[in-house]
Amino acid sequence: ATTKTLRILIDWEQGKVVWQQPRTPNATAEDWSKASHNLAYVKNYNLYITDNRGNQLQVSHDGSRELVYGQSVHRNEWGISKGTFWSPDGKSLAYYRMDQSMVTDYPQVDINNRIALCKPDKYPMAGMTSHEVSVGIYNVESRQTVWLDLGERKDHYFTGISWAPDNQSIYVTILNRRQNHDETWSFSALTGKRLQKIHEEDNEKYVQPQHPLLFLPWDDQKFLLQTENEGYDHLYLFDTKGNKLKDLT
């Protein structure tokens, strides 16, 4: 539970507060790990973590309106709704870094004030240069970031970020700019090295990756894949070597 000043963990069976932590004023995009009680958030364009002992760790230092950390990217397309992703043990944080310095401003009108205000937004018009996205992994214990080897095309779409249950690897779906081909790869969470392609989709019109992988709680070598690859939204059972084991729907 949260109040205006505190984040509180309550044991309902015992009827008492078992953990609490002060909230950071003006923090946005808060993402709390139930496993470690570490909290990620964005403030003044930079990404921070408050660990379970109350220490504030600054993950990024060069954030600005043009260089954005820990927030949703690609204009919330492809199932993207946030910019931080805790590992299952809550000790590592995957996050987006979006460089939009090359994107032109587009005028937006803010009508929340009595007199409307013009507030420019970074918006790439059709055919113009788009922003570039990277994915980093910050280790809370070492306080170091490694960057995933996503390839040379930083203007591709990167979505479906999902952690393996063992905290050692992470999965990302890479969608090309034409939006008709995607590949899902595993990466080392320790080095950022690209490990294995586990799934690929191709369509003459478009593909629509919308969902991260969902690992089975009782088998960390198998996961569910949700896709419209065959024309309708279906679930499939895969293993971590990329083998399709079963059509579930």
What spans do the regions from the language model cover?
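Beta-strand C-termini and the immediately following turn/loop, strongest in propeller blades
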Residues: A1-T5, H37-N46, D51, K82-F85, ...
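Short loop/turn segments that connect beta-strands within beta-propeller blades
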Residues: W12-G15, D51-G54, N139-R143, A189-G192, ...
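Beta-propeller fold detector
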Residues: W19-P22, Q56-S64, V146-D149, R194-E200, ...
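Predominantly five- to eight-bladed beta-propeller fold
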Residues: K4, L57-T84, Y95-W147
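Beta-propeller and related beta-repeat scaffolds in trafficking/envelope systems
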Residues: P124-M128, R153-K154, E200-L214, T249
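Repeated scaffold domains used in trafficking and secretory/extracellular systems
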Residues: A27-D31, T159, Q208-L214
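Short glycine-/Asp-/Thr-/Trp-enriched loop segments that recur within the blades
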Residues: R65-S81, R153-F158, N203-H211
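Asp-box/WD-like beta-propeller blade repeats and closely related beta-sheet repeat scaffolds
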Residues: K4-G83
